[in-house]
Each structure stands twice: as C-alpha cells, then as structure tokens.
Amino acid sequence: MNKQSWLLNLSLLKTHPAFRAVFLARFISIVSLGLLGVAVPVQIQMMTHSTWQVGLSVTLTGGAMFVGLMVGGVLADRYERKKVILLARGTCGIGFIGLCLNALLPEPSLLAIYLLGLWDGFFASLGVTALLAATPALVGRENLMQAGAITMLTVRLGSVISPMIGGLLLATGGVAWNYGLAAAGTFITLLPLLSLPALPPPPQPREHPLKSLLAGFRFLLASPLVGGIALLGGLLTMASAVRVLYPALADNWQMSAAQIGFLYAAIPLGAAIGALTSGKLAHSVRPGLLMLLSTLGAFLAIGLFGLMPMWILGVVCLALFGWLSAVSSLLQYTMLQTQTPEAMLGRINGLWTAQNVTGDAIGAALLGGLGAMMTPVASASASGFGLLIIGVLLLLVLVELRRFRQTPPQVTASDS
C-alpha cells in the first residue's frame, strides 16, 4: 500500500496542454492584478487619507464582480466560452490602460478610479465564470479536484510575487508603472489563451436566467451542509478584506513603501504553502470539522494581526491566516463538488464564487467604516475577534457539517 503524499500532484500540467496554457495565462494575470491591487488602495489613501474611501473602492469593485459573475454564468452557458474568455481579458486590459493614463495626470481623478474599478471588476468576472465552466472540458471531470488545487497554488504564488514587485515599483516609479505593467501583462495572457480549443456550451433547454439562479438559491437554503459551507466561505472572505487597512497600519508601523508589499504578499504566501501541502486534505475522515476549526484559527490570526508591536510579526499572523484559509477553502471546494447534485454544480459553484466576492465587498465596507471611527489597530482586531465569536457559534449550530464523515478514497501508486 502506497502512502499518500502531503505534496500536491502537478502531473496535469504535463498531460493536458490546454490546462497548461490556462495555468500560464492565469499566473501572468494574477501577477498583473497584484500590481493593480497594491497601487489602487495606496493611490486612494495618498489622495484622500481616508480608509473609508479605500474600502469604498474595494466595495464597488466587488459589487461589479458579483454582477459580472451572474451575467457571465448566463453567457458561458449560451455562447462559445473561448470567445467570452478572450473578450473579457482584452476589455480588462483597456480599463487598466485608463487607470495608467489617469495616474499620469497632474491631478488624478478619484471618480475615474472608482468607475474603472467597476469596469474591470465586471469584465474580469465574466472571464472567470467562463473559465470555470470550461475547466471540466479541459481536464476531465475526474481531474477537477487536482486542477482546483493547482489553480489555487497558481493564484497564491502569483499573489506572493506581484505585491513585492508592486511595492518596489511604488517606491521607485509611482502608481502609473503598476497600472501600465498590469495592462501589458493582461494583454500578454491572450497569447496562451488563443491556443485553447473551441469550447462550445453544452446543449440545454432554454430557461430564464433568473429562474435558474433562484433554483440554486433554494438549494443552498434547503441544504444545511452545502449552505453551511457557503456561509463559512463568505465569512472567511470577509476576514481577508483586512487588506484595506494595510496602508493605514503601515503608517502606524512606520513602514516604507517597499515594505508595504510584504503585507500584501503574506496571505498569498501562507495560502501557497497550504495549497502545496494539500495532498492529504481530500483523505480527511471529518472534513467538516477540520474546515470549521481551520476557519476559527484563521479568524484568530486576523484578531492578533493588528495587535502585533512590529510589522514583521503582523506579516507572520497574515501568513498563518493565509495557510489556514487555504485549508478551509480547499475543503469547501471538495465538499461542494461531492455533496452538490450534478445538475446544480454550475450554479452552486457560481453562487459560491459570487458570495465570496460579496463577503469581500461587505468586509471592506465594514472595515472602512470602522477605520473612520476607530484606530486601524482596533479596527483589525475588532473584525478578527468579532468573526471568531460568530465562528464559534457556527461550530455549535452547524451540527450536520461538524459531524459529517466521509470514506477516504483508495490510494493508488499514481496518487503517491
């Protein structure tokens, strides 16, 4: 009997060329978006000196992404998915060019930043939805879990590298360089995506989009197991919105512009480690309990983050949050795929992604509001410990999720 490895199996990148192209495009895209993610809050903080305004930008972008995910789900089921992906990526690049040109003005427009955030959030989510819908055709349904873990690792590694580069660019060239390179990277992603095969939508009866979405909502509300997983995912994403406080906390810790990048890189770094060492997660006998406990630990890490006397200790707390949130997220993904009926998988995955975006937007708005009334340190701690209390209550209430057991799959030589 072969012992299951802790490490993630990357063989899909060798055996599936189309998935390899998506992997490359996604990595470049994440690096580009990371440059943007550092520049926007820092620019708004410098222009307004208001954490509320920083939170508002994240909230508006998150709202646009939510709408884009809903619209994108309909488009991906009715039109050729490769075309939807390419159109969405190219349109996003145009928005990044607009941010670059705005940053070069003597007096950049705050309204333009907000509007372009809406633009990019909407079109970016169109591409995400189409790519999610196309993934089974690219890798085969039997490889979806492995593809999901590789995708998480790609996103996290890119998110580690890009904030560090973004911080250095801020210290040397200003936000315009961040926006310009983000636009260039986005257009470069079109090259590997052009090699994808045609991805036509599956034949299906015509149904009003709202009716289909309502059926998905009803399933979530009726299933304490799947609904509980979705609720935990939303709360976990709310906690990650602590990044809107990074610029203000950086001032409190007297960090340089280059050091700010370490704050943005810490969570992705921890999550990358979590994804890379996720080989045994799918074999957990009680994944629901493990999901709940890892989520509670993540909330505790955020509560302690703002209390740290030195920024390097804060980075450690953020990395711990990233690792625990990766464990929880991978378990959420696995259980959603196995506990959701085949006919509901598309809608439930879309709604799960959308509620994560919504949780991020709500968390950003709440933290921005807290930042206007409290110190950044108090805001970060209040959010973390508040979510921890809610998490403990859910640990007691979500009985079916807590007690859920599964039979570990058989380990073969190819899995080791």
Curated annotation (Swiss-Prot):
One Pfam family in the UniProt entry: MFS_3
Highest taxon in the source lineage: Bacteria
Periplasmic-facing ranges: 43-55, 105-109, 178, 240-256, 308-313, 378
Disulfide bonds: none
Keywords: Cell inner membrane, Cell membrane, Membrane, Transmembrane, Transmembrane helix, Transport
Keyword Transmembrane helix in annotation: yes
Record-annotated membrane-spanning stretches: 22-42, 56-76, 84-104, 110-130, 157-177, 179-199, 219-239, 257-277, 288-307, 314-336, 357-377, 379-399
Membrane topology classification: Multi-pass membrane protein
Ranges of the Cytoplasmic topological domain: 1-21, 77-83, 131-156, 200-218, 278-287, 337-356, 400-416
A cellular-component GO term for this protein: plasma membrane
A molecular function (GO) term: enterobactin transmembrane transporter activity
InterPro entries linked to this entry: Enterobactin_exp_EntS, MFS_dom, MFS_trans_sf, TM_effector
Protein localization: Cell inner membrane
Protein family according to the UniProt entry: Belongs to the major facilitator superfamily. EntS (TC 2.A.1.38) family.
Record-linked PANTHER family: ENTEROBACTIN EXPORTER ENTS, INTEGRAL MEMBRANE EFFLUX PROTEIN-RELATED
Function: Component of an export pathway for enterobactin.
UniProt-recorded name of the protein: Enterobactin exporter EntS
